[in-house]
């Protein structure tokens, strides 16, 4: 790992165009402001042919799904995609496969300028934290900043086809077992400033109402964001209407009004496609945040998120890529470009950068107190990348791993039978 820089000097992205300045970085890898004099350590310096931007935040990702990238047909809808990927192969996921898949995903993110990622991980496979630890190991091996949502999955569809049911059974954990594993993992990473573990929930179709209540409460108690898939497809709406007599956001709103959860302002929900305007009003009232995954939603035919409706209500909006195997790539810059083209009714500035609440150190902006996470572009291409002031990509190459030798070769070997 490279030494942490004490300052970064060059032309930074500004509202009116590039601005020349030098930002100071403290020993913990946070921006302290513009440098007042010569730095006491190494300075990263770039000329006028480079542009320095904050590192992108991928606010919703399933990195282990990168193992399926060569197996998919881009024409598959969501149900077909699930049948031929996670419900066919996730029960076969070993620690090594999770590690290699995540190294592939995190490495490709860093090469695309993504410096922090929020992961939703539910592939526990009856192994406690064994597979979860491999995601964390991959983040450390590549150098990315990881917000790890240890996802609870406590619902098995009894009428599911055999492979789907077997997969769901492998993800399943009782609330008590889940909470023990979560607490264990939080303790294990508590001294790592680049890894945060938080409770996460899958969805209304993969969680009981008890599980949802406990997860929301746990996140509030810990003061951590809780990730949750919200109305990604019509099925969750139909399920909530059948079981609870209300639409998904109405169910969440009712939990607050009955005092079962203290609030929803720490929920980081993804997709939000099949959400009515009245539900958006309640989301704004309860201060939920939304992660949109527009390219993935288009590709699998899930639907189109009403970005303007959310932004009009001042609901904080982040961008994510979901999994690589259900998207074109893992670039948030490409996600942003697609959103600006696909949503001409939305002001481009609304799809820009915003602060992401990474525990202990916010990220996403080049401002004092934020993590010193930067991407340096030369002719529009990512040249160098810094995470917490340490360079992890140089001249378009990941510094910590040889991706072709250390990841791609063994991954192809381990999954060869999947392609036959």
Protein language model annotation of sequence segments:
Residues 1-21, 28-30, 36-38, 353-420:
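Active-site microenvironment of metallo-dependent hydrolases
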Residues 55-59, 117-119, 146-150, 197-201, ...:
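Hydrophobic faces of well-ordered beta-strands that scaffold small-molecule active sites
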Residues 247-263, 305-380, 386, 390-394:
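His/Asp/Glu-enriched, well-ordered alpha-helical/loop segment
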Residues 130-267:
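Metal-coordinating catalytic core of metallo-dependent amide/deamination hydrolases
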Residues 220-225, 257-258, 263-265, 282-291, ...:
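Glycine-enriched alpha-helix->loop->beta-strand junction motifs that scaffold or abut catalytic
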Residues 69-145, 177-191, 412-420:
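Alpha-helical scaffold segments that flank or form the walls of functional sites
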Residues 67-98, 127, 155-175, 234-264, ...:
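Active-site gating loops and adjacent loop-to-helix segments of metal-dependent hydrolytic enzymes
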């Amino acid at each position: 790992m490279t030494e942490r820089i004490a300052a970064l000097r060059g032309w930074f992205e500004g509202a009116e165009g590039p601005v020349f300045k030098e930002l100071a970085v403290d020993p913990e890898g946070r921006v302290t402001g513009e440098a007042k004099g010569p730095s006491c350590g190494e300075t990263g310096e770039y000329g006028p042919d480079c542009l320095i931007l904050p590192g992108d935040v991928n606010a919703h990702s399933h990195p282990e799904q990168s193992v399926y990238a060569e197996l998919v047909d881009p024409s598959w809808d969501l149900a077909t995609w699930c049948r031929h990927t996670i419900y066919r192969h996730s029960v076969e996921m070993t620690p090594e496969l999770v590690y290699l898949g995540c190294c592939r995903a995190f490495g490709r993110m860093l090469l695309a300028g993504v410096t922090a990622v929020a992961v939703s991980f539910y592939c526990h496979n009856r192994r406690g934290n064994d597979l979860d630890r491999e995601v964390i190991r991959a983040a450390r091996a590549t150098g990315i900043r990881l917000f790890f949502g240890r996802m609870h999955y406590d619902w098995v569809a009894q009428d599911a086809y055999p492979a789907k049911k077997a997969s769901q059974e492998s993800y399943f954990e009782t609330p008590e077992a889940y909470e023990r594993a979560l607490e264990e993992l939080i303790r294990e990473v508590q001294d790592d400033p680049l890894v945060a573990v938080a409770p996460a929930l899958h969805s209304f179709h993969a969680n009981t109402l008890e599980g949802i209540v406990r997860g929301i409460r746990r996140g509030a108690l810990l003061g951590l964001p809780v990730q949750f898939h919200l109305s990604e497809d019509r099925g969750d709406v139909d399920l909530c209407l059948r079981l609870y007599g209300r639409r998904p956001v109405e169910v969440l709103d009712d939990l607050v009004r009955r005092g079962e959860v203290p609030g929803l302002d720490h929920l980081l929900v993804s997709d939000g496609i099949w959400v009515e305007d009245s539900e958006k009003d309640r989301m704004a009232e309860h201060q939920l945040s939304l992660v949109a995954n527009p390219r993935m939603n288009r590709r699998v035919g899930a639907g189109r998120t009403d970005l303007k409706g959310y932004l009009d209500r001042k609901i904080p909006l982040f961008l994510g890529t979901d999994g690589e195997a259900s998207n074109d790539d893992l670039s948030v810059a490409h996600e942003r470009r697609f959103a600006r083209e696909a949503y001409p009714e939305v002001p481009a500035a609304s799809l820009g950068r915003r602060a992401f609440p990474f525990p202990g150190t916010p990220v996403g902006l080049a401002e004092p107190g934020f993590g010193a996470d930067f991407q340096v572009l030369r002719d529009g291409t990512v040249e160098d990348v810094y995470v917490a002031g340490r360079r992890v990509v140089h001249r378009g190459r990941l510094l910590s791993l040889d991706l072709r030798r250390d990841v791609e070769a063994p991954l192809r070997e381990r999954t060869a039978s999947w392609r036959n």
